[in-house]
Structures are given as structure tokens and as C-alpha cells.
A protein has these predicted regions:
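N-terminal basic/disordered segments at the start of proteins
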Residues: 2-41, 62-64, 114-119
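Acidic, glycine-rich loop-and-beta core segments that form the ion-binding/anion-interacting portion
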Residues: 213-230
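Short, structured active-site "lid" loops
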Residues: 45-64
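Short glycine/serine/threonine-rich phosphate/pyrophosphate-binding segments
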Residues: 13-17, 205-206, 228
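Anion (oxyanion) recognition and catalysis
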Residues: 22, 72, 213
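Hydrophobic alpha/beta core scaffold segments
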Residues: 14, 28, 66, 72, ...
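Cap/lid and interdomain-hinge subdomains that line or gate substrate/regulatory clefts
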Residues: 1-2, 60, 68-206
């Protein structure tokens, strides 16, 4: 049975997360575009590489749901929507719309936002995304030709393009460990939040995230979270 099925919004990101999964001990196969055959033998994870980062939101949703259908046919235990660690998107999407569509299809009312990749200088603190110690909106991403990032606060970025409230699990909670992090996520869900941004300043934070999230149907983020889940 397939343990993790990754739906990646571009080829480079797909290759990135596939390498992280393999390096952390999970046999992984990367497939370009929505698969048509059966699951390759001998793998615990499949990474589906799409081209949905900057296409129209409805097309991104269509392709992502098609990938999800295939993953479900393979008995996939957990779906991982992978996007860039700089949260490349606009108020129109595509991170929010695709996340919402996957949540509906998987019948889940809550998921996480975890773009951090500390090894590459992408960290999240108090819900703010940093690139090499600079706030996202003060990095080179501010002048991105397709998806200029002029805000650094991930809950605000997510709420602008999605269908619910977004909270934050701060680094201090992650420092307290798995039980505290799990309890904090549960509280946000009970309070009606639909998404939770997870702080991460180091790999230990990602490991804790992975332990907490190992059995949930859907996670979203960059490649870093794969370290904890593999």
C-alpha cells in the first residue's frame, strides 16, 4: 500500500521532495503528469509532478484532483500537496484553491501549511515566512515576475485565497514537543480554524511536525516536512 502520495505543483519541487523522501529512507518514484497505469512496484511513496503553480486556478484544481483520484486508487494513506517553500501564489491561488479542493475530496475539514525548509534558509516564525533571514516580502521574491510576494504573513496570504480561517502553531509550542503540538492543533480545529501554519526554525521542528501529522489524510507544504514524515 502506498504510504505517501505527493501532488507537486512543478517539476523542480517534485524532484526536490522525492530526493528528501529517498534520503530519509522511503523508496520513492517520481512520475511526470497524472499517471494512467498502476503504482510502480517497490515504492512507499509516489511523487506526481504537475505544472500547476501559475496556471489558472480551475486548471490547477482539475489536474490536482485527477492526480488525487489515481492516488486513491492505489490505496494511498496520506496525500501531500507540495508547493514552493516561498509560498509562490497570488490572491487568486493556486495554493488556497487546490488545498480547498483536496480537502473536500478527502472529506477533511482541517489541514496544515508548512512551507519551511531551514536547510535552504526558509524558516517560519510566528507565522511569518523568512528567506535567508529576510522577511519574504523583503526578499527577492517581492519582485517575482509572475507571483510577486509582497506580504510575509502566511495566515493572511492563505486566507486571501482560501475558504476559511488560518491560525498559527508557534515555534514555542513545537519546542514543547509532540503532545503539546498535537493539542494546539486540536484546539485550533475546535475553534473553527480550517488551516494551521506551522512554525519551523530547524529540522527538529520538522521532525515533530512529522510525528504529529503521520496519520492525517492531507498535509501541505514545501519539501521540509517530508523529512519528518518519511
Amino acid at each position: 500500500m502506498l504510504k505517501i502520495g505527493v501532488i507537486a505543483d512543478d517539476f523542480t519541487g517534485a524532484t526536490d521532495i522525492a530526493s528528501f523522501l529517498v534520503e530519509n529512507g522511503m523508496p520513492t518514484v517520481q512520475i511526470n503528469d497524472v499517471p494512467t497505469g498502476t503504482q510502480p512496484e517497490g515504492c512507499d511513496a509516489v511523487v506526481i509532478s504537475l505544472k500547476t503553480r501559475s496556471c489558472p486556478a480551475q486548471e490547477a484544481i482539475k489536474q490536482s484532483l485527477a492526480a488525487l483520484v489515481w492516488l486513491k486508487k492505489q490505496g494511498c494513506q496520506q496525500v501531500y500537496f507540495k508547493y514552493c517553500s516561498t509560498f509562490d501564489s497570488t490572491a487568486e491561488g493556486n495554493i488556497g484553491p487546490v488545498t480547498d479542493a483536496l480537502m473536500v475530496a478527502l472529506d477533511t475539514s482541517f489541514t496544515v501549511i508548512s512551507p519551511a525548509l531551514p536547510v535552504n534558509g526558509r524558516t517560519v516564525y510566528q507565522g511569518y515566512l523568512f528567506v535567508m533571514n529576510h522577511l519574504l516580502a523583503e526578499s527577492g521574491m517581492r519582485h517575482h515576475p509572475i507571483n510577486p510576494m509582497t506580504d510575509s504573513y502566511l495566515p493572511r496570504l492563505m486566507e486571501a485565497q482560501a475558504q476559511g480561517r488560518c491560525g498559527v502553531i508557534p515555534a514555542q509550542t513545537l519546542d514543547e514537543g509532540v503532545a503539546a503540538t498535537r493539542a494546539a492543533l486540536s484546539r485550533l480545529q475546535q475553534e473553527g480554524y480550517r488551516y494551521a501554519v506551522l512554525d519551523a526554525l530547524n529540522e527538529r521542528h520538522l521532525e515533530i511536525q512529522g510525528e504529529v501529522l503521520r496519520d492525517v489524510p492531507l498535509v501541505t507544504g514545501g519539501s521540509g516536512l517530508a523529512m519528518g514524515l518519511a
